[in-house]
Amino acid sequence: MIARLHRVWWGLRQESSWGWRELATGRLRWQIDVIAYRAMAFPSVARYYKKHELDRFRVLKTKGGVTLYYRTNRGDIQGIREIFIDEIYRLPEHVKVTGLVDLGANIGLATVWLATTYGLTGVIAVEPLPENARLLRTNVRANNIACQVIEAAVGTTTGVTYFAETSESNLGHVADAGREIPLVDVREIVNELSFPRPLLKMDIEGMEGELLQSIDPVWTRKFVAMVMEMHPEIVNVGELVQIIRDQGFEYRESYEITKGYQRAKRERLFVRQEI
């Protein structure tokens, strides 16, 4: 019991989201959800949330005018913290983008943050799970973002595939068995881009290896920058980094920022060398 209480306390001290000053409405509800998220170390709390709260929608509004719809599962709460508070997708000032292709958009948190932060005029978001895609559409509509939502998994061919799901919303992945979902070839998406200076954001739970190694990675040259999460337990990160470098990108490795108890991480960034 003492060990669990210590983990909850330590987690809250690390939780930069606890004191999110940019919230205009929904702060108390958000703080309760953050406490519950950390308190799920206790089985009774986890059971209650799974039974009563897991799929309920919450609404937050920031002082900057952004509206976010989320659920009380781990993936949504953690995603808000990482993307809106820790700003893991913030780009260097010299990198100028006007559009976005978001592979693995989930409920649209990164889509919304990138589009509103950088004033993007062209946005494509790809998400395979219907329940996530519905909330993705809700979030982009709520923030007046012109976004084409593609409800499919991304791969190296077009057809159907299987998707293994989890209760945490952001950890599902393409698998040999599971829910049958549409599959779209990444090259079809890229070849139809109509906006200039696009950014690629990719978080597809290990499928990045297939997109970069199973087909010619020349498709990446369409982008002025790419920010992505790589999964070293699934892919060889060094090999993927070299593949992208060979396409003319400069690599900036992910790194961690520590401020007191708070820790934040920037994702791996690739910038075209001519920028």
For each of these PLM feature ranges, what is it?
Residues 1-275:
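Phosphate/nucleotide-binding beta-alpha loop and adjacent structural elements of enzyme active sites
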